[in-house]
Amino acid sequence: MEIDIIGLISACSYALDCIEAELVNIKNKHGKRVAYISVRMGQYFDLPEDALQDLAICALLHDNALTQYISEELQKHSAKDLTADLVANTTNLHCIYGERNLAKIPFKTDVTNAILYHHEHADGTGPFHKKWDEVPLSARIIHLADVVDIIGHSGAFETQRWDMVKQYLIRHTDKLFDAACVDAFFHIFSDNEFAAFRDDSFETKLWEIVPREKQTFGWETCKNIADFFAQIVDYKSSFTSRHSIGVAEKAAAFAAYNGYDPTQVQKMYLAGALHDIGKMAIDNDILEKPDKLTDELPAKKMETTCWNTVY
């Protein structure tokens, strides 16, 4: 089966951005900006083409376990406490979950610990207490790109934002960030290029560096990818654990029973696994409201619109 893996993961990053925007007020296209900054830095370090593609995938999915983390931790803490915990980066759980989830994604190179250690500090004060020379370059790059985007794009695009980013990186060199990554960032980006994020032209440049093209994968790999996305969607709400996988399995079973050929059966499974991905853009207050949704109907209709956007 042919899949544009980069395009599919890019679409998933949009859905993840919706969750982060709801929870910690991060701007739209956060995942893509982190990916763009990361691959530009990867080019500076002369990473080969396959490694750049894998770096882009890891950057797009660096917070892939956010819904799982939220679902499990909300059972222990209030939403207010959880938001503060995420902003402070005082937990390593979403890194552990995220690293484990990536086992379902078909990488071309070794990306071990790219997600697990993407919140580590250069001086060893991060969640796992690993110093910069114990952390893969990919994780160090994503860490810097993630923080830069959060600081630089948490408000309007202004010159003072660039100054804020510069001062933050300089002040935390050899503390939060290793000097090599900081130097790479400053060699690549200027205030003018940083301001270009305003018009989203960076996205075109991202796909020029990491081309979107269809690749052929076996059914097991395609199923793993679909299950990966379904898991992210189902953790969005406490009412939908394994819901998408259940729909996928039943849709495939019905298709087989009605005489569909094997390829059509597989496509029905994929459709079932992804049928609720639009819910990622809907607030949990609406999804879990134990009452009629008359007032929320316009927002609920957006689920279909968001599904089409992701699709």
Question: Each PLM stretch: what is its role?
Answer:
Residues E2-Y311:
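Metal-dependent catalytic cores of enzymes that make or break cyclic nucleotides
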